[in-house]
Amino acid sequence: MEINGFKLKYSAEELTKKVNNEVREICLIDKNEKEYVDLTDGDKKALDYLVNAAKIMNDVALELDHPLNLIQKQALETLAPGNEYVSNALLLFNFINGVAGYNGLDKDPVEIFEGIHMYKGCNFYPTDLDENEFHEIIIKMLDENKVDEVAKILSSRTVVRRKGDVLEAIDYTEYFSEEFSEIANEIECAAHFTTDNMFKEYLKWQAQALLQNNVEMDILADKHWVKMQNTSLEFTISRENYNDKMTPSVFSNKSLIERLRGVNINPVPKDMLGIRVGIVNKQGTNLLLKFKDKMRELVNKMPCSELYEQKISDGELKQTMVDVDIVALSGDYAMCRGGITLAQNLPNNDKPSLYRGGGRRNVYHRQVRFAGDSEKTKKILINIILKF
C-alpha cells in the first residue's frame, strides 16, 4: 500500500507483531485521577493550556526531525479509520514519533516507509548536504570572513538552509515564529490561571523566551525553572541535542576545528525540542528530598565506592528534585527510540544558564517508572549486586 507515493515497508502481519510485542504502553495521568481532582480550578485550567502548548511543540519537533514527518502523519491519520493495516502503521509512527528511528534493539532503524530514511543532520540541515560538502562550505565561508554567519550555523538553536553556494542559519524563533507565538500564547494563558506565583513567574519568562531571538531570555527562563521546588505543576521545554550528527562532524576534521577555535566558535549540536507537562507528586517528591539530604551517606554505600572518585560537593547541592505524574510528553520526549527516560536532569552542560550561576532540576517520571516490570528489574539488580 502506498501513502503519498511511499509504500509501507512492513506487511500487515509484521506491523501487528511490532505494535503488539515490541512496544511498551505507558498510561499517563488523566482528569479522573485523584492527583488532577485535587488541583485548584485555576491550576486545572492552566494544565489544559499547557497540554495545548505541548501538542503544538510536537509538530515543531516533527519538522526538525524529518521533512516528511508531518505530511506522512497527516496521511496516516486520514486513512487509519476502518483500516487496521494503516492504523497499526500510525501506531508505530506515534511510538517513535516519526517516519523512522532506532528501537534500541536492532542495528538498523525502524523505517515505516520504503525509501524514507533518517538523515545525519535530521531536518536541521538540508537533506542533500553530506558531511564533506558541509565542511567545504564552512571552510569557504571562513575564507570569506563570514565568521558570524558560521557561528550561527554551528549554534544549537538554528535551522540551516542553502543560500546560493553557502549556508544560511535561521534562529528557531524566526523559523517557527508562527508556532512559537501560538505556544507562547498558551503558556501566557496558563500563567494567568495558575494559582502558584512562582510557577506563574516562570511561565511568563518562558513565554517571552519563545518570542525573542535572544539566548539571554532562555537563560532567564532556565534559572526560574530550576528554582521550582514547591510548585503544584510541572512544565518543561526540553532542549536536548543528541539527534544531530552533522554539527559534531566538524570535530573529526582537525584543521577545521582548529580554525573554528581560532575565531572563538564552539560548535554545539542542534537542540531537538519537546514539552513535558505534569502534576508534582508531593509524597514522591518528599521521599526524593530525603535521599538528597542523605546523598553523601548513600554514595559510600554504593558497590565498589572505593574505586571511583566522588563528585558530591561539600556545600548544599544546587539542585531541585521533583517526582511528577505525567500528563503529556511531546516532541523529543515522545521520540521513544530505544527507550524512554525515567528521569531527566536539566539543563545540560552546553546550556549557558549552567555556567551563569544557574543550577539543575531533576524531574522523575512516575508513570514511566510504574510501567516497568518490577520483578524483572529486581532480578537484574540482584544479579548486579551479586557480582560484587
Q: Where on the chain are the PLM-derived regions?
A:
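N-terminal helix-rich structural modules
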Residues: E2-Q206
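Catalytic Zn2+-binding segment of zinc metalloproteases
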Residues: F388
